[in-house]
Amino acid sequence: RLAQNMPLEVEPDGQPNSKNIPLSNLHFNIYYHLGLAYYLTANYEQAAKAYRKCLQYSNNDDLLCATTDWLYMTLCRQGKMTEASQLLEPIKEKMTIIENESYHQRLLMYKGLRKPEDLFPGKSGNEDETLNLITQGYGVANFYYCTGKKEQAQDILQKILRLDNWAAFGYIAAEADLNRGL
């Protein structure tokens, strides 16, 4: 409600991207992180509501991919696979992605254009690569979970926690899922 009647304004993110172009806006960040908070507490109905609102403020391909990915996973957790699949319509192989390549690749996996094992090969190196593995890994784990491959999902979630990057959203989500007995 705080931003309801406020104009859309670019919000500089913590770390500059490769093009030094801030991509997110205040409204996006409010609804994106609200959706994440609901998702992490398994309140998928409220998470979906927040992510749908967030889509309204996803005004570039990076934000569209990030929001679509979390909303897709949220709908999968609710068993709404048809609705989740419909979200993938605007996602194309060629998009203008500056920051959220991991989310873009996950969405292409959901569409059947990438293989899960290509997104999460199970190796890690530098800090950026570790963050990428955590992000990719969580999407792959969730994909396995939602397609009935619970053991494979649990295996990847445990691998994510061994990568030890506790601030990454995928790490936090993996920890929450394992604590809930996924």
Language model features: what each stretch is:
Residues R1-S24, Q56-D61, S124-E127:
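Flexible helix-coil transition and linker loops at the boundaries of alpha-helical arrays
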